[in-house]
Amino acid sequence: ILKTSGATYSILSKKDILDKINGIKNMFPSDWKLPNVYLLHGDLTDEEMNYLYNHPKVKAMVSFTHGEGYGRPLQEATMVGLPVMVSGWSGHIDFLNQHESLLVPGKLEKVPQSQVWENIIIPESSWFNIDTNSAYQGFNMLHNNIKKYQSQAKSLMYTNRNKFTLEKMTQKLDEIVNNYTSDMPQQVELQLPKLKKVKESV
């Protein structure tokens, strides 16, 4: 199952992705039995995403992202105990680890010129490219040891459900903000001295 889209959820975006899928499949000999690719294109509701995460045929979540600010879908997957295989770099490392998920190694490389996007992805930017051999090994490890990775994912689920509650994140944010603002000037109430009333002269 491939859930993705281009810059929009348009018909042209969907056609472009389908063309890319077919282009990749055509790189292999015609007598090879390739797996089916089911494209989910567009925006899904929270209920639909939850159904997808918990579908009995969905065994793991895989993302070879070049970089994430946070990676919400990845954390959502951990919250339901779904094994995660993902690029071993960027924001999602805050809630994933090598012992309870599969972090694929790679390296930071300059973005291709074709991916430069004005004011978004500048020519001097770098992004993370996975090591494809490690990714191949990761797929085999997941397939051959799914029970092991499901058990590890359950452990990570309990950790993240306890650690990333709204209450605890509010407390964490408060600690961070206080750490940087404790020495800032504070507003002080102006207290003028009390003066004795001057007697009127006769």
Question: Residue ranges of each PLM-predicted region?
Answer:
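C-terminal amphipathic helix plus adjacent low-complexity
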Residues: 6, 116-202
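Nucleotide-activated donor-binding/catalytic signature segment of Leloir-type glycosyltransferases, i.e.
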Residues: 11-52, 59
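Conserved sugar-transfer catalytic core signal across GT-A, GT-B, and GT-C glycosyltransferases
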Residues: 49, 73, 80
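Acidic, amphipathic alpha-helical patches
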Residues: 49-50, 92, 173
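Aromatic "clamp/platform" in nucleotide-sugar-dependent glycosyltransferases that forms part
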Residues: 66
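A short, glycine- and acidic-residue-rich donor-binding loop in the catalytic cores
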Residues: 70-76, 84, 91-96
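Short hydrophobic beta-strand element within catalytic cores of glycosyltransferases
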Residues: 83-86, 102-105
